Amino acid sequence: MSGCDSICAATAPPHVRAIAPYQPGKPISELARELGLAEADIVKLASNENPLGPSPFALAAAQDALLDMALYPDGAGYALKAKLSARLGVDAAQIVLGNGSNDVLDMVARAYLAPGTSAVYAQYAFAVYPIATHTVGAHGIAVAARDFGHDLERMRAAIRDDTRVVWIANPNNPTGTFLPWNEIEAFLETVPPRVLVVLDEAYGEYLAPASRCDTAAWVVRFPNLLISRTFSKAYGLAGLRVGYGIGHADVVDLLNRVRHPFNVNASALAAAEAALDDDAFLARSYALNAAGMQQLLGGLAALDIETVPSKGNFVLARVGDAARINTELLKRGVIVRPVAAYGLPEFLRVSVGLAGQNARFLDALGEVLAAAPGRHPDSRKALP
């Protein structure tokens, strides 16, 4: 152990040392360096990014904001919150802005959790939920999944006297599962008022119109509800990092107390505000995803690969020896997401891309499977 390691081991709290760092999807530039590939020849379907990129409105606004980069941004995000307020039908005091929605989740942990408290989340929950929980020394309660998603009955039963937060994603990441809104509403009616329920809707824009719900209106009935949303997915602003939370004004006030100053940069604020004006781009993103999802599902079925029904912009596919198959895909310049860290070692998560990107992945996967047809028999198990 080096001197630095020894000092860190002696001074960092045990709950911090026990945290496994978040592993993002492999960047295109990293794979290019590792294998000597041209970046233009690499397809990345690993991080659920919008293959269309950002709205032209957002891009122009972000570029204009760069002219004032010597100045701090509006720390309160007045203009963006005003536009969100009008769009959502809530008061601006009910909105908190984050450096991506992950920042909002982190604020929740710092405002509501501490050693001696607990948070409840599903077995296959977004990795940031346990990370945020454990970072502040709280206890995480992982509840067994039902059909790869949330079992709300078990999650309600898991709430203890020391529970302060329940994390729910709808649709869920990394599995793509979806809970009917009436089930979530019924769950909220049973949760003790002292417990904050965080409803993560990062992928909400990919839901079919008939499956959408005005959950922002729920905060009047459920003051212990916080809704988390992002501009990183359907809006195509992942690189700028901007998200927001909607909740009771008292909850938002607490989050603002732990929010870092100037946590959303000027270009992100400007781009997000402009993106809200481009409904045509959002509709195009939805349509592209719907078509791409069908392309992926059809191609995977043709390869006899089972998938978990998904309402997001990605699909979870059981391929068997996922680690080996992922390595072979990388050699072919295709980046997808292994999910062994989520307890799903037989699966790969594949983001929906452009038609050509989806075809490139399916062709590469078919090539890999043909080269080693004896894949793990579990890859053929029926999924819900």
Swiss-Prot record:
Required cofactor names:
pyridoxal 5'-phosphate
Give the pathway annotation: Amino-acid biosynthesis; L-histidine biosynthesis; L-histidine from 5-phospho-alpha-D-ribose 1-diphosphate: step 7/9
The chain's coiled-coil residues are: none
Alphabetical list of SUPFAM superfamilies matching this protein: PLP-dependent transferases
Keyword presence, Iron-sulfur: no
Instruction: Describe the reaction catalysed, as an equation.
Output: L-histidinol phosphate + 2-oxoglutarate = 3-(imidazol-4-yl)-2-oxopropyl phosphate + L-glutamate
Q: Which InterPro entries match?
A: Aminotrans_II_pyridoxalP_BS, Aminotransferase_I/II_large, HisP_aminotrans, HistidinolP_aminotransfase, PyrdxlP-dep_Trfase, PyrdxlP-dep_Trfase_major, PyrdxlP-dep_Trfase_small
Entry keyword set: Amino-acid biosynthesis, Aminotransferase, Histidine biosynthesis, Pyridoxal phosphate, Transferase
Which EC numbers characterise this protein's activity in its record?
Answer: 2.6.1.9
Q: Which CDD domains match?
A: AAT_like
Gene Ontology MF term list: histidinol-phosphate transaminase activity; pyridoxal phosphate binding
Report whether Transit peptide shows up as a keyword of the record.
no
Top-level EC class as recorded in UniProt = transferase
Q: Name one GO biological process term.
A: L-histidine biosynthetic process
What residues bear N6-(pyridoxal phosphate)lysine in this entry? K233
Family, according to the entry, reads as follows: Belongs to the class-II pyridoxal-phosphate-dependent aminotransferase family. Histidinol-phosphate aminotransferase subfamily.
Q: How does it assemble?
A: Homodimer.
Q: Which HAMAP family match?
A: HisC_aminotrans_2 (MF_01023)
Q: What is the name listed in the Swiss-Prot or TrEMBL entry for this protein? A: Histidinol-phosphate aminotransferase 1
Question: Which organism does this record belong to?
Answer: Thiobacillus denitrificans (strain ATCC 25259 / T1)
